[in-house]
Amino acid sequence: MKQATRSLNLPKPIAAYFTADKGNGEAVSQCFTDNAVVKDEGHTHKGRPAIREWKTDASAKYEYTCEPLACEEKDGKTVVTSHLVGNFPGSPVDLRFFFTLEGGKISSLEITP
């Protein structure tokens, strides 16, 4: 994945996630706690190995760019709205990334349209 750059004041673990999200599943998984949970496209991925596999598979399947547009705090979560463009069904699309942080890492992420 190619990363578009935009000046947002993202919390460090979330900024690290978007920086790592360039097709490197291992780098992405290191942004998460050991027992983190990711929910995306109707699937739940639990723990770093499953998160690494999720990101590696998604990056191999599609080419896309992701540009974070907005960031807000809501109900204890950090919500980042991002614009994605690529060779996936429904492109382009704005997605919302609901992050929960714990100890300087991401403990949960849910991605929704």
Kindly give the residue locations of the regions a language model identified.
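Short, hydrophobic secondary-structure boundary micro-motifs
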Residues: S29-Q30, K39-D40, E67
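Short clusters of small/polar residues that mark proteolytic maturation junctions
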Residues: H43, P49, E110-I111
